[in-house]
Swiss-Prot record:
It catalyses: sulfate(out) + ATP + H2O = sulfate(in) + ADP + phosphate + H(+); thiosulfate(out) + ATP + H2O = thiosulfate(in) + ADP + phosphate + H(+). Its EC number is 7.3.2.3. This is Sulfate/thiosulfate import ATP-binding protein CysA. The gene is cysA. It comes from Pseudomonas putida (strain ATCC 47054 / DSM 6125 / CFBP 8728 / NCIMB 11950 / KT2440). The keyword Cell membrane applies.
Length: 329
């Protein structure tokens, strides 16, 4: 099921949430809408679902304009950040709910419903919890049950609104890897909203970077990271440094893309060591370049030669190994 977003705009009073958005999502693709709070990503997801109405523009599913269709007629599965499970129902009944609510002529028999529910619970690896209640589950388990419930009605499109946002970091990492594997198995056109760059990079086939109601860049994780369209995309997709040049330009580079030396070396810049911070396998060194207010951060392996006996206040020499040259604004 392909999705086309055509010239979609949405305003809430004086706030322009979306401004002439155009986006094509291929059938079977997993796309991340990535951006900071207030960028319009959740509004766009809700418009695709039919939960919000655009002021202008169209939503097309597989060649059919569904802009005037009610959310119930779009056949989408929606997974919210906070699970939205029915607390008074067992896991089994939560997953079965959508099937039991179908019109009488479309409703499967109870035996078919039971078969489908157990199939989905096995798929999310939680069939052994079928008789439990939501409060007896961990956050990660609840979110997997919410996903199984969304898939029970066999939607054409799966939409996920920050599905892992309410979970702790370790569970989030496990679940996003699980979701990527699951998507490979079910091959269902899916769109998920996130503000977590690492999550988008790890899970999505393509990333749509949004800011202030517009799309800044669309591309594969590798494309948006290695070939950012502008300063905003570069900074939003990871830690970054800015080094001013004398000819009205500056260069952008990542902390892990820095060469360090204790000795003055050709092509290296002198800087004062302001902080040395061990981070496990790596160490972050914060540097101050004379004449520049912005600090430079470098991350190197913890046993790097330049770190031996290094102390704050000393002079260290650095060189960006990979950089992007940008004109000053």
């Amino acid at each position: 099921m392909s999705i086309e977003v055509r010239n979609v705009s949405k305003r809430f009073n004086s706030f322009q949430a979306l401004n002439a958005i155009n986006l094509d999502i291929n059938s079977g693709e997993l796309v991340a809408l990535l951006g900071p709070s207030g960028c319009g990503k959740t509004t766009l997801l809700r418009i695709i679902a039919g939960l919000e109405t655009p002021d202008q523009g169209n939503i097309v599913f597989h060649g059919e304009d569904v802009s005037g269709h009610d959310v119930r007629d779009r056949n989408v599965g929606f997974v919210f950040q906070h699970y939205a499970l029915f607390r008074h129902m067992s896991v089994f009944d939560n997953v079965a709910f959508g099937l039991r609510m179908k019109p009488k002529g479309e409703r499967p028999s109870e035996s078919k419903i039971a078969e489908k529910v157990h199939e989905l619970l096995n798929m999310v690896q939680l069939d052994w919890l079928s008789d439990r209640y939501p409060e007896q589950l961990s956050g990660g388990q609840r979110q997997r049950i919410a996903l199984a419930r969304a898939l029970a009605v066999e939607p054409k499109v799966l939409l996920l609104d920050e599905p892992f946002g309410a979970l702790d970091a370790k569970v989030r990492k496990e679940l996003r890897r699980w979701l990527a594997r699951l998507h490979e198995d079910i091959n269902l056109t899916s769109v998920f909203v996130t503000h977590d760059q690492e999550e988008a990079m790890e899970v999505a086939d393509r990333i749509v970077v949004m800011n202030k109601g517009v799309i800044e860049q669309i591309g594969s994780p590798g494309e948006v990271y290695d070939q950012p369209a502008n300063d905003f995309v570069y900074h939003f997709l990871g830690d970054s440094n800015r080094l001013a040049l004398s000819e009205g330009h500056h260069v952008l580079f990542r902390p892990h893309e820095v060469s360090l030396s204790r000795h003055e070396t050709e092509g290296h810049h002198a800087a004062e060591v302001r902080d040395i911070r061990p981070l496990g396998a790596t160490t972050r060194v914060t540097l101050k370049v004379e004449g520049q207010s912005e600090l430079i951060e470098a991350e190197v392996v913890k046993d790097h030669d330049s770190l031996t006996g290094l102390a704050r206040g000393e002079t260290l020499f650095f060189r960006p190994k990979v950089w992007q040259k940008v004109a000053d604004i």
